[in-house]
A protein has these predicted regions:
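Short, exposed beta-strand-loop hairpins at the edges of beta-sheets
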Residues: 216-217, 222-228, 232-240
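N-terminal Sec-pathway targeting helices
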Residues: 6-18
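A short, Trp-centered hydrophobic/proline-enriched beta-strand micro-motif
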Residues: 48-60
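Solvent-exposed helix/loop surface patches that form functional interfaces
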Residues: 35-51, 65, 118-211
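Edge beta-strand at a domain terminus
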Residues: 146-152, 239-247
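N-terminal mature ectodomain segment of secretory-pathway/periplasmic proteins
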Residues: 59-138, 230-231, 235
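Bacterial N-terminal signal peptides
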Residues: 18-28
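Short, small/polar residue-rich loop motifs at catalytic or cofactor-binding pockets
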Residues: 51-52, 95-96, 198, 219-221
Length: 247
């Protein structure tokens, strides 16, 4: 079993990964010294979760290459987010499924994902305290187990092509306090932990609609989230010329 510290490991998410799949954050995530960044948030959700359901169109250079159908709903005493994404590319189609379970305070409990395309892969992740244990299954290979250790139990799961998960990041942001706020994150399909910094850009008008904008960034890149009340309606990754738009 390999153990990795999320506080010291250099990490990245490819803007465009194999088979034309768009990386979850479309960012490069790099860990930096604790002295140079704000400490990751360890407090629970600022805004309560609400049930939601919808579809995101995935566009690159203005052309739709896929879509995600998602739902966020209560699951007993916890909450579940289910996402199903289909991506079309010259190398073939890719189908991704992700299921995330979090406590009401936003702390993750369990996550599983699977992908079918040129190759099949799947994984389950169990969160216990500050440790995330991943069991990865790759087609034609033996199962592989890896552990990641974080500074605190509060970790945001942001996986490839499952954009509804950014809803949880927006809920964790303290809108009253505003300013830069740093969060520990895990990108399961890339097996990469790291941190992101989130800041409020304020109210914007997009296509005649008033929305709140959050900027998610690292030292290398950024992605903009647009929210109508508590609903995530748009994501923009300028460096990848990509947009994720709610239908």
């Amino acid at each position: 079993m390999n153990e990795n510290s999320a506080r010291s490991r250099s990490t990245k998410i490819a803007p465009l990964v194999a088979a034309g799949i768009i990386g979850a954050a479309l960012l490069l995530l790099h860990s930096v010294s604790e002295a140079s960044v704000l400490p990751p948030r360890t407090r629970a959700l600022i805004a309560p979760l609400v049930a939601d359901k919808g579809t995101f169109k995935i566009l690159v250079s203005g052309q739709q290459i896929g879509k995600e159908e998602f739902s966020i709903a209560p699951n007993g005493a916890d909450w579940s987010a289910h996402g199903t994404t289909d991506i079309q590319s010259p190398k073939g189609n890719t189908h991704v499924i992700g299921n995330l379970v979090v406590h009401p305070d936003g702390i993750p409990v369990h996550y599983d994902w699977s992908t079918q395309g040129a190759k099949k892969a799947s994984a389950t992740i169990t969160f216990s305290g500050v440790t995330a244990t991943v069991e990865l299954h790759l087609e034609g290979a033996r199962p592989f187990t890896q552990q990641f250790t974080f500074a605190a139990p509060l970790v945001v799961v942001l996986d490839d092509n499952l954009y509804c998960q950014y809803t949880f990041l927006a809920r964790l942001y303290d809108w009253d306090k505003k300013g830069e706020q740093t969060f520990s994150v895990l990108v399961p399909q890339e097996m990469t932990p790291g941190t992101v910094t989130v800041d409020s850009v304020g109210e914007q008008v997009v296509n005649g609609q008033k929305v709140q904008e959050l900027r998610v960034r690292t030292e290398d890149n950024e992605i903009d989230l647009f929210l109508d009340g508590r609903k995530l309606v748009r994501l923009v990754a300028p460096a990848a010329n990509a947009e994720i738009i709610r239908e």
